Amino acid sequence: MSPLVRRIFWILNKFFMVPMFRLGFGPFLGSPFGGYILVLKTIGRKSGVVRYAPLNYAIYKGNVYCISGGRKTSDWYKNLHANPEVEMILPGGTLYARMEEVSDPDERLLITRQVLKNAGFAGFFEGYNPWHISDEDLQLKIADLPVLRFHPLGVGNGPSDMGGWAWFWMLAITVILIVLLAR
């Protein structure tokens, strides 16, 4: 991915995707074209500050899986290794989970293909079509790609819970309705 495209995704993720998920609009953002996205809440390995990372994902056998397109250089990936227990804001709810890397080659192949298919147009940014590439070619392409399994441990804080932002739009709509009805 070119530096320009990477920067565009960074801006889109930071100023649109993360706020929309924190406001509770995650269920309205997923589509086959745009991809299915979750927001990972990590703890900064140096700062200790909560960081948010929108990621494409797949659910398989009760676990949530993600891949690190930036390989091992992504900050969120490094943060996970410092603190592998995270909260994940999925469109249907929030989970508290523990991360582990997938090492089994068959599982890596199956999961990577599904995550890339679930990524919509972004799934093609690896330089191939995840729907049509052969298993052998895909295994070669993903040799250095971290595949991460998140095993759910419990429920996390969602947009409507403490620390979420859903209260903001609910309050705004309430105020607007009161103003309109008072006229």
Segments from the language model and where they lie:
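Extreme N-terminal tail/first-helix region
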Residues: 1-30
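Charged, gly/pro-rich active-site loop segments
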Residues: 1-10, 93-177
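N-terminal first-folded block
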Residues: 20-46, 168-176
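A short, compositionally biased
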Residues: 33-36, 80-84, 144
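Short beta-strand segments
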Residues: 35-70
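Short conserved beta-strand and strand-loop elements enriched in small hydrophobics
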Residues: 40-41, 84-94
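A short mixed-secondary-structure module that forms the rim of ligand-binding clefts
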Residues: 62-87
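Juxtamembrane boundary at the C-terminal end of a transmembrane helix
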Residues: 177-183
